[in-house]
């Protein structure tokens, strides 16, 4: 019992005391450990410390005499007790001394369901800089309006071209026009939100930026641009709206094109505000492609180039590549060779075949004797792999369809064959054609990769000139 008490006393009282005193003991016994770099004599070191302490005390007394208070404050104290209306003592309390408020922001509270979360934050929360930029725009806009109001309207000379559209779309007077029901349906006329709540008989304040803060500067900006496009004082033939985009002089686009352009821009702006996904844009693009705008020439040119580029198409891997098993191959896989016992396999084997190669050799050597029997009942004996390696039989009605017999006049076939042999100069193959039990397979030489790449890029580049491009979103 006594021993337990002693242990507890040691653990709770003596040990912390020792640990508190220990660093100082160590320091003062080994003064050369005080700084890691220079070794100072003990008495010199003590003198230095005492001098520093003395100077500090002098400074502290002087500050207290001048009315300064030096005390440590916690973070919360600093945060709560700084009152900017009545600057504290340590700022010097003279009016010309600036007071810098250094407060760390509050750490974020964890989200809770009890409190209202602002999500997402408005751009105006970024505050002054953003509003300042918007104001720059609005001031500029106002200046432009006033200038154009005072300007003497210059006559357009020569008179603009007659509109290419039917007369319904050409009606463009200063009066607000009454629209036929057809054009009223087709026009997208967007009434942007007003400044304040709309009241019935109240004349609206046309140039007000904000009234009772009903909308942000951003909405005001949208409203101004909308008034410039659709309002009463709108520009009739804005610059950049024509076939040669020279402004009102060279003859502008018809109203229908102009309206379409404006509508498209407006919709794009709405899309950007709303945010859209990859999925939406691909839907738009496929709808565009389905509506037959791609010129057929471009598609055919591109197809021609891509089909002749063999390099990236996959070579045959047994049950990995269904396109290869349908025999749309860059390199046609050679049919299995009949081997004699002492002969090395000449063809290069793929993964699965390499695994079974010895077994296959043994089996095929045995099969040479029964070859006639095997050809008789081929369907019963052939495994899946054999069918896949068999170059004939792409369609199951192949045995019913004969090759068309080409008939030449007398001796012409022989002449054709001879000239073909002379042109080929020893055959089309890099490797000699392998004679198998089925048929002779000649692998076409592979195109070197840089040639293939060049050919593909060239094709895509050429065909891109023949396409009428979609609107990119």
Swiss-Prot record:
The keyword Membrane does not apply. Residues 155-165 have a biased composition (Pro residues). GO terms for cellular component: host cell mitochondrion. Residues 168-197, 341-397 have a biased composition (Basic and acidic residues). Its main location: host cell. It is found in: Host mitochondrion. Keywords: Host mitochondrion, Host-virus interaction. Residues 105-124, 142-201, 232-253, 327-437 are annotated as: Disordered. Transmembrane segments: none annotated. It comes from the Viruses. Residues 243-253 have a biased composition (Gly residues). Belongs to the HHV-5 UL13 protein family. Plays an essential role during infection by modulating mitochondrial ultrastructure and thereby increasing bioenergetic potential. Mechanistically, alters cristae architecture by interacting with components of the host mitochondrial contact site and cristae organizing system (MICOS) complex. Interacts with host MICOS complex subunits IMMT and CHCHD3. This is Uncharacterized protein UL13. It comes from Human cytomegalovirus (strain AD169).
């Amino acid at each position: 019992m006594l021993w337990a008490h002693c242990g507890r006393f040691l653990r709770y009282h003596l040990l912390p005391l020792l640990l508190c005193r220990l660093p100082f003991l160590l320091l003062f016994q080994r003064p050369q450990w005080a700084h890691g770099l220079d070794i100072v004599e003990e008495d010199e070191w003590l003198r230095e410390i005492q001098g520093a302490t003395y100077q500090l005390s002098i400074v502290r007394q002087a500050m207290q005499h001048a009315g300064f208070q030096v005390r440590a404050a916690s973070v919360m104290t600093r945060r709560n007790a700084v009152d900017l209306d009545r600057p504290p003592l340590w700022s010097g309390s003279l009016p010309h001394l600036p007071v810098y408020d250094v407060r760390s922001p509050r750490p974020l509270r964890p989200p809770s369901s009890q409190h209202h979360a602002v999500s997402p934050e408005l751009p105006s929360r970024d505050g002054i800089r953003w509003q300042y930029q918007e104001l720059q725009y609005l001031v500029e806009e106002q200046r432009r309006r006033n200038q154009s109001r005072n300007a003497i309207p210059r006559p357009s000379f020569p008179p603009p071209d007659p509109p290419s559209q039917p007369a319904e779309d050409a009606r463009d007077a200063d009066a607000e026009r009454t629209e036929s029901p057809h054009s009223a349906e087709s026009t997208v006329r967007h009434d942007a939100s007003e400044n304040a709540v709309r009241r019935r008989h109240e004349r609206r304040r046309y140039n007000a930026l904000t009234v009772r803060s009903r909308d942000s500067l951003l909405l005001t900006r949208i409203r101004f641009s909308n008034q410039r496009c659709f309002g009463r004082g709108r520009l009739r033939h804005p610059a950049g709206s024509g076939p040669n985009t020279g402004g009102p002089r060279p003859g502008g686009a018809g109203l229908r094109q102009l309206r379409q352009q404006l509508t498209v821009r407006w919709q794009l702006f709405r899309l950007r505000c709303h945010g859209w996904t990859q999925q939406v844009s691909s839907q738009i693009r496929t709808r565009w492609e389905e509506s037959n705008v791609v010129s057929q020439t471009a598609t055919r040119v591109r197809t021609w180039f891509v089909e002749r580029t063999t390099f990236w198409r996959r070579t045959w891997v047994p049950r990995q590549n269904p396109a290869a098993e349908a025999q749309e191959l860059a390199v046609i896989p050679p049919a299995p060779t009949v081997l004699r016992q002492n002969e090395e396999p000449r063809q290069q084997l793929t993964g699965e075949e390499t695994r079974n190669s010895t077994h296959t050799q043994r089996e095929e050597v045995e099969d040479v004797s029964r070859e006639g029997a095997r050809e008789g009942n081929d369907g019963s004996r052939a495994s899946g792999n054999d069918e896949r390696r068999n170059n004939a039989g792409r369609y199951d009605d192949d045995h019913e369809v004969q090759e068309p017999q080409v008939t030449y006049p007398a001796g012409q076939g022989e002449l054709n064959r001879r000239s073909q042999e002379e042109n080929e100069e020893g055959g089309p193959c890099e490797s000699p054609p392998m004679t198998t039990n089925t048929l002779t397979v000649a692998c076409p030489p592979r195109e070197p990769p840089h040639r293939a790449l060049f050919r593909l890029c060239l094709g895509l580049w050429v065909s891109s000139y023949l396409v009428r491009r979609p609107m990119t979103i």
